[in-house]
């Protein structure tokens, strides 16, 4: 769980908390709820990149690797190490029995720019950015293990892809198998299909998962006893300063689909995945919706598979259903706009005006449902972000491009 500014930081770190941050009691309740269904919460703390939530504050702005960017912390500033240590300490206080921690380290784009880093590069590191990165990661990992007792430290792989060939032998999984006892794959069930995407396309996310299965079989020699598991991520933003993307209720069927697929793969079982998924989500057989609902002006709705889970019974299904209705409506509106470019505009304009009223009704319903799952500031942000529900990008709908020549 990446808390970011939702963690109940205190004392010298209290400025990191947002107004609606969890308190200690809520954090403990989250842990207890997870434990009750056989899950452990592995805290994820950013220790290199994605540090905007801290570096945006004046108190810590001097720790930026580049003063013009607040995403990357300077690894050569001892106050940076103090900040990271204090964050891990407070995380450990509320996760006192957790064996693992994730120290992030993805997307640290500005490295080796601060004067302190430049000094190290020109003296002890022989100009090697790779060594600068590795020394910081290993220092933080040792801190988490030796000072705070975490047995396992996880780190994202992408920062290691930039390392020179002299650090590890050639061959990705071959070299990793010589260094790491445990390797995880990490896909996404939501939050990776567009910076402001609101509609979860299950098949697109499944393609990544299938590619991992293929990758495993191609490299089974090196991964057989080291692939420890698969992390199914569900991001809510691309970064601290970007808009909200797909909401969690909208991603539940995608999560279920991937979890079932991973379970079958890891346990080497072949089952009827779609049927199992519908049983898992407590779905009823859809009789009430005619197939004509998904056909408009000769076009067929491309996301019928996602829509059918609106009849299921899982936490958040009410919001999921309205989001899917919104997806269907904006698809029909996109078709009307497409047709208006190649036919007479009067007829299609009348259709669009009728749809405008449907968009307004949907927005009102969604606004009411959002309050059941999110804090008020998140609801306000989503509504401000989508002031008009008929303003989504149509590129993901698969419509042909009109010839306007």
Question: Model-derived features: where do they sit?
Answer:
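Substrate-binding groove of N-acetylhexosamine-processing glycoside hydrolases
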Residues: 32, 81-89, 93, 99-100, ...
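Feature activates predominantly on carbohydrate-active enzymes
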Residues: 1-146, 155
